[in-house]
Structure formats: structure tokens, C-alpha cells
Amino acid sequence: MRTTQFEPSPAEQAAARQKKTNFMQDNTGVALTRRQLLGRIGLSAGGAMMYQAMTSLGMAAESSYTGPVKLQGSPKGATVLVLGAGLAGMAAAYELRKAGYKVKILEFNARPGGRNWSIHGGDTYTELGGASQHCGFDKNLYINPGPWRIPHHHRAVLSYCKQFKVPLESFVQVNFNAFLHNTEAFGGQPKRFREIDADYKGHISELLAKSTKQGALDKAVTKEDQEILLESLRNWGALDRNLSYVMGEESSVRRGFAKYPGGGVSGKPEHSKPMRVEDILRSRLWATLAAGNNYEMQTTMFQPVGGMDQIGKAFARELGPGVIEYNARVTEIDQDERGVTVTYEDTTAPGKAKTAKADWCVCTIPFSVLSRIPVKVGAEMAEAITKLPYAASVKVGLQFKRRFWEEDEAIYGGISYTNLPITTISYPSTDYHSPGKGVLLGAYIWGLNAFDYTSHTPEERVRKAVEYGSQIHPQYKQEFDNGVSVGWHRVPWTHGCFGQWTEQLRERYYGAATQIDGRIAMAGEHISYIPAWQEGAILSAHDVIGRLHKKVMATGGAA
């Protein structure tokens, strides 16, 4: 997604510490309700993280995909104009064409995919405000500024990948050899995921085991079940026969050895010493241990070989030539009882208005952009279009002279987490041991920090990502080659990352947003309960074309 000194300001450091300590309480120090907690997660971390939280709280479900779309009955020459060649728009067009509709797509960009987007070496991207970046990555290297992983249960996306022969490979979400980092813990030195994972589980298991032995659970657990519980804690926490988590064989096989077993005369291993329970707890590094346990992040996860944009390109191939008109900026959407008229201009030759007409329209333009375009819809839908905020997010892709994370750190895929504004370093899950340069995701930023980073120039975002990342990987400064950054509020075709529904906004406006308003219907990730995911975009398209087809059948086809 998109080398010098740039230290975090005292204000940034203070904000990060305050965010860590106050997140679970309101301004009065009172614990938050589930609804309040989800709202705060959405505002500070984004809708994708809020959806993960909803999953863990039992408030979200897997994809509702049940199989290929089946539109029964002939549309009798009905025409549909689709606005936007993202996955929602192309999925709608593909299925409608199969059912016999005449379909045309108007797309702002010179390529298909929308937010299904990869920046490859040699690409040029110009953001709002005019800043232009030419990606200096080597050939075949890329970054995904938008979606970058596909859960195994996102069946609609995966079904199209299979149908269109888009090759997939595993995306490594959890790597026990990656790092967890907090500037306020362990002298600012990063710790391996496995060390924090093993020591946290070990200490918690020991505390619970001792409480059980002392009778603290007598009222909650029978004596027989207490013995089973102790056995499970010994296994889960790598406790010794005395139910203690201490330096020894049991703990070292989980957290790693000080000296690993080898061969020959000097092959005897040396056990490592666990960190103290108070240090583990106060570090708060345990907060990211469960990231891979969330339903959306559980293995197996996938990515297309060669970049996420391979899916968008495959859709465009299947649609065939002439269906998508690129470089088309929509300036007005009108409708009457006979059909829809869309006014647009060619972005390569602006100033001359063009029009496209159809019986029906499926609009996948994000509300963040659509709210700036005259649209003839009813008052309720018009209000819904203007009320949905879009999340701020920034991604920074960094190319290095060598894959030092593999060569020096033995990190192959996965994610390191930090309390620094960059939040995330994600290592490539492909081309292991390949010679030459490599690209990693050097920052994935949400919330207020994302607004801050978006306000900087692309070059400054890259510099900050390198400076912050060097606190985790000192090799950064010597090995850095070039970078590219994308602040989603500066992306011309979205003006934000994704639709950030809250429970209150959904209750008030979601129903209106999903209705077919005369001859115009909406689709996209923002018209779904799987925000920010490609699955939500495709499922919204499937839903709306099913309802639209029923309406067409009821009215006899073409206008």
C-alpha cells in the first residue's frame, strides 16, 4: 500500500501512552460498555479493527456467501450503468452480463480494481494536492496500499479467484519470531513474539494454578475438574512438576533457548530465563498476542501471487474489452421514471461533458466522493450519503537493499507490532531467500496518527517510517533504498479508506443507503456489515443485483 532523523515528538509519545492507559475507560474512569467500547475502537483504530472486536465480543459473523449468483429470467434488453470498477462494481457487472443485461462501467482511474490496488515498481501515483510519487521498487516488487489479505472464510472473493484462475499463496499473519515493541518497556528493546507469548501464558498459568491449589476456585470448580484444570494449565503454560513457570526445559521449548541444541561436542543447549511477571504485565505487549486469534485473522489467510490487484485485473479480463470506460469522472447523476442519465468527463481531456444513459444504475462510488456529486435521489438516501464518515489510514511501503529480516533475524512473513505511530511492520509472505532487494510494509497507521501522517508530504511519511522502524530494526538506516506512501484521505477516488459505520449511524441511515431509490442502487464495502473487506464489497453487489433483478422482472425488463 503506499533516511534521515525524524524523532517522534513529545506530544506523540505522550498521546501514545495516554491512549494505552485510558482506552478501556471513559473520561470519568468508569469502565466502558460493549457498545461504548466498540465505538471508541472504531474512532481510534478503524472499522476493520472494530469488526475484529465485534467478532471477539460475539457480535459479528462470517461471510454470508452461499454460492454463485443465480438471476432467473430474461431482462429483455434492460441496460445497467455501473459507476466504479472496484470489486463491487465489476462483480455486479459480471453477474448482470451473465444474466443477459447490457452493462457499461464508468471508472475514474486508468485501471480496474478501485481500492483493490497494488503499487509496483515503475508505477506513478498522484494524490490530492498534487504530490506525485514514482515508485522506485525493483521489477516484480510491490506494496498493497489497500486490501492485503484474504481470510479463508471470505468465500465470495475466493470463489472468484478460483473461477478466474487467480493464483493464491499463504499470507502469514502470526510469526512467533517477529517482534513486539513498546518504547516504555524493556528499555525500548523489542522482544520476540514467542518470548512474550510463552512468558505471559506461563506466569498466568502459574498464578491460576496456585490459586486453584489454595482453594480459591472451590466454589466455581469441582475437585475433580480442578485436577483437570491443573493438568491443562501445566500443559498450556509450560509449567514444571511443581506448577511453576521457571527457567528450564519446559519453558525453553516455548520461549526459545539461550543456546539452541546443536551437534557434536558443543551441542548441549542452554535454557533461557523467563522475564518477570511484573515486567510482562507492565509492558502491555500481551495486548497484541490475540491478534491472530480474531476470526478475521485466523489461519489460513491468502494473498494473490504478484499483488492484490491481480483480482481486479482478472475481473476486467473476464468482462472483456469495451465494458469499462476508464478515466471517466462522474459529475452528475440524474434519473426519471424512464431511466438514469450520468454526466461525466474524460480526465485526460477535461472540460467537455459526456453523458451515458441506462435503464438502471448501480453506484459503487464511495459516499465520501458521492457526497460531492449532484445525485437525484430521495431525501433519506441523500442524507445517508452525507452522514457516513470515512476512516483515515496510511500505509508506507519500504524497499531495502537486502532482505535483512530474513538474513539477520530469521523472520519469514508475519507482523511485528509497536506502540510507535507506525503500529505495524509486515514482512513479505513470498519469495523467501530471493536475492537482491526486498519490500516490506513499514507502517499501517489508523486514527488520529493517520490524519497527522496524511498531512505530511509522501517523502516525510517515508522518512518517519524509516526513523521509527529503525528502533525495531537498526538495519533500516543502512539498508533503506526507497519508499512509497499512501494516505487514504488524499486518494482522489475515495477521500478516505472505508465507510466507518457506528451502531448509531447504521440504525439511522443504513436502511436508506441500501434501498433501491427509483432506478439507482448503491453497492460497495460501505453497503455491508463487513466494512473495509473485499468480501463486503462483493456481497453487497450480489445482494443489490438480486433485488434489482426482481424489480426488473416485475416491471417487464427494459424501460
Each language-model region and where it sits:
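N-terminal glycine-rich phosphate/pyrophosphate-binding loop and immediately adjacent elements
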Residues: 66-209
